């Protein structure tokens, strides 16, 4: 039984002893005074029911839920939530106001029922009406239609809050000080759980597909993942020596890899000094034996291994570079480890106020797009960062320069972590470098399933028996066959 109902019953029992002792005369049934007392009793029961329903209905509406309805609900829901929001913001004052007037109605009910009914009848009626009319029915209605009921009665709530202000406001402030305010926002883990619950795979009626839930979860996890988790290890990266020749063999390897950018190293593959844009080789003739150093080599930015992927993505999307060398910083540093470093030939590096990176990936393109950016004689371990550019960095340029290159990270690597799936194109040799799953394996499975498919769904061969026959493939290899899936070198992830 509700505590207030127990108080009502106790008062009615106390009224029995008092009436028996005083032998007071009951008010005649049907008289004006009886009708007045009966009307007041009915009003108190209904008023108590409204207060009880509003307490449950309004207090169950969270601030986040109301903001969501204001932004994405129907026009009716937007109007209702906008009307309720200012009242629900004062949660403790609203709670004290509703409970105060609910208690007043419950306390006043026995006083009037005792004057118009027999004591035993008054107890039965009081408990019954208070339980069903004052508690069960209002709360059941407001649980389902709390938004609509609250919006229609918000004017009454405002009046009651003004009337009870001298009492409710001090108590509400005390509750705010003691209990504090509830945090209406969700944490990252809670958002991921909420998204997964709304997915179709959860079987709870959600509309989000598996791809949608996967991408949203990947976006939430991206801030916690670092460059080392997404990079391609330097041992598995295809790169070129700066002193090597761009002969036919080298050009065939570059073409077979199918990458748009190739890291360039000096002496040691871990000593990455820049990157080569493959499109700059269009004018290079293999028979001339041009050195890699004679082609436009662009500087490659360096990032610490523990740099968050969101910081890398923010710099990649500026368009200056889509590849960076991941460096394992030797020195220990304080603060957030998100520093991006690049080798600069004389220019002053400028740091953006909105970025924790040391400098933009490329500050300036000298001349045309094929101009040489890196000076080979100054590329080994030197740094040209101004004092202004060093301010506010977690890692100094010297620490990054002295660090060992452990891998290469590209924009595609970041997207794969975002999508949580491997991106495979027609030139990739491996689906997953770490698991070493070859693309050819997947292609063989696809061809096998295609061969078992009905003739109407096959991509090769005539649709009908009367059509032209498909010519047999020649057993003699073509000159370009060695470029298609014959590379057995280490896997690579630098696109």
Swiss-Prot record:
Residues 231-291, 296-356, 357-426 form the CBS domain. GO terms for cellular component: cytosol; membrane; mitochondrion. The keyword Transferase does not apply. GO terms for biological process: magnesium ion homeostasis. Residues 1-42, 114-120, 168-495 are extracellular. PROSITE patterns: CBS (PS51371), CNNM (PS51846). Residues 456-477 have a biased composition (Low complexity). Pfam families: CNNM. Residues 330-354, 455-495 are annotated as: Disordered. The modification Phosphoserine is found at residue 352. It is found in: Membrane. The chain crosses the membrane at residues 43-63, 93-113, 121-141, 147-167. Glycans are attached at residues 349, 353. InterPro entries: ACDP, CBS_dom, CBS_dom_sf, CNNM, Ion_transp-like_CBS. Residues 64-92, 142-146 are cytoplasmic. It is a multi-pass membrane protein. Keywords: CBS domain, Glycoprotein, Membrane, Phosphoprotein, Repeat, Transmembrane, Transmembrane helix. Residues 30-212 form the CNNM transmembrane domain. This is DUF21 domain-containing protein At4g14230.
């Amino acid at each position: 039984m509700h505590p207030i109902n127990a108080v009502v019953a106790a008062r009615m029992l106390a009224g029995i002893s008092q009436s028996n002792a005083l032998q007071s005369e009951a008010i005649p049934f049907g008289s004006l005074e009886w009708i007045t007392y009966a009307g007041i009793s009915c009003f108190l029961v209904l008023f108590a029911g409204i207060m009880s329903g509003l307490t449950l209905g309004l207090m169950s509406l969270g601030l986040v839920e109301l903001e969501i309805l204001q932004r994405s609900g129907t026009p009716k829901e937007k109007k209702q939530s906008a009307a309720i929001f200012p009242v629900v913001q004062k949660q403790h004052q609203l709670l004290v106001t509703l409970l105060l007037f609910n208690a007043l109605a419950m306390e006043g009910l026995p006083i009037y029922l005792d004057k118009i009914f027999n004591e035993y009848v008054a107890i039965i009626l009081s408990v019954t009406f208070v339980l069903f009319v004052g508690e069960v029915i209002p709360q059941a209605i407001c649980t389902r239609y709390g938004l609509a009921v609250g919006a229609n009665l918000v004017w009454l709530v405002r009046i009651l809050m003004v009337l009870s202000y001298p009492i409710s406001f001090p108590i509400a402030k005390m509750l705010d000080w003691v209990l504090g305010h509830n945090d209406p926002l969700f944490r990252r883990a809670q958002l991921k759980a909420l998204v997964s619950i709304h997915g179709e795979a959860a079987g709870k009626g959600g509309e989000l597909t598996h791809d949608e839930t996967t991408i949203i979860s990947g976006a939430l996890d991206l801030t916690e993942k670092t460059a080392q988790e997404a990079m391609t290890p330097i041992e598995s990266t295809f790169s070129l020596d700066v002193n090597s020749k761009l002969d036919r063999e080298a050009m065939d390897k570059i073409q077979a890899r199918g990458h748009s950018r190739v890291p360039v190293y000096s002496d040691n593959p871990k000593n990455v000094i820049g990157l080569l844009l493959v499109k700059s080789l269009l004018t290079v003739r293999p028979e001339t034996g041009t050195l890699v150093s004679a082609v436009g080599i662009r500087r490659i930015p360096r990032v610490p291994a523990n740099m968050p992927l969101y910081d890398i993505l923010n710099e990649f999307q500026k368009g200056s570079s889509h590849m960076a060398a991941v460096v394992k910083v030797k020195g220990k540093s304080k603060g957030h480890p998100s520093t991006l470093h690049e080798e600069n030939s004389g220019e002053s590096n400028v740091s953006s106020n909105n970025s924790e990176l040391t400098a933009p990936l490329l500050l300036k393109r000298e001349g045309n797009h094929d101009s040489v950016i890196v000076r080979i004689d100054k590329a080994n371990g030197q740094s040209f960062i101004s004092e202004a550019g060093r301010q506010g960095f977690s890692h100094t340029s010297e620490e990054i320069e002295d660090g060992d290159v452990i891998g290469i990270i590209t924009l595609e690597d970041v997207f794969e972590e975002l999508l949580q799936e491997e991106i495979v194109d027609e030139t990739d040799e491996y689906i997953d470098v770490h698991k070493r799953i070859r693309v050819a394996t997947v292609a063989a499975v696809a061809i096998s399933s295609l061969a078992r498919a009905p003739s109407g769904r096959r991509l090769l061969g005539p649709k009908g028996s009367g059509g032209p026959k498909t010519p047999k493939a020649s057993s003699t290899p073509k000159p370009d066959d060695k470029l298609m899936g014959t590379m057995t070198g280490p896997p690579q992830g630098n696109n």
